[in-house]
């Protein structure tokens, strides 16, 4: 719905999805904490980044239907840069989660390094003049990121 009104619909989608980890945190810990909000912010940035990448495939349909998106408004080259910046901010948020009160350690840090590497790989697949690998980047790489980071967190919390 927001695509009818603003090019920043990617943000609203990210905000909607970020409610899940914050809500899970509240359900388990019965509090909203700085840590839960950092996790939510990381999810927002992750979703913004990959939704912008995927929206590059829809640029012509968006224009034909007078819908708004970052790629439609700013062009594919700028959209790719904005997606990369969003993913970089996500990694920063994930690194801030290493604060001492969160009790995550070196295994989690290795997971964040893997996520950062996968995001760089994801962005290397997509070129402004060749969007043929967007689906692979969107579905495969992001699937590995989500399951991989969860696995590293579980190992760090349970076995280390």
Q: Where are the regions that the model predicts?
A:
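Multi-pass alpha-helical membrane architecture of UbiA-family
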Residues: 1-160
């Amino acid at each position: 719905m927001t695509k009818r009104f603003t090019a920043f619909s990617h943000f609203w989608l990210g905000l909607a999805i970020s409610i899940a980890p914050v809500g899970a945190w509240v359900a388990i810990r019965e509090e909203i904490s700085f840590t839960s909000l950092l996790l939510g912010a990381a999810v927002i940035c992750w979703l913004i980044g990959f939704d912008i990448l995927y929206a590059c495939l829809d640029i012509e349909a968006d224009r034909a239907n007078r819908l708004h998106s970052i790629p439609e408004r700013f062009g594919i080259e700028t959209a790719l840069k904005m997606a990369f910046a969003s993913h970089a901010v996500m990694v920063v948020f994930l690194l801030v989660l290493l604060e001492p009160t969160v009790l995550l350690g070196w295994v989690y840090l290795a997971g964040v390094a893997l996520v950062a590497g996968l995001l760089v790989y994801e962005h290397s697949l997509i070129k402004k003049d060749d969007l043929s690998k967007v689906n692979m980047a969107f579905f495969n790489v992001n699937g590995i990121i989500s399951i991989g980071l969860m696995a590293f967190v579980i190992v760090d919390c349970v076995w280390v």
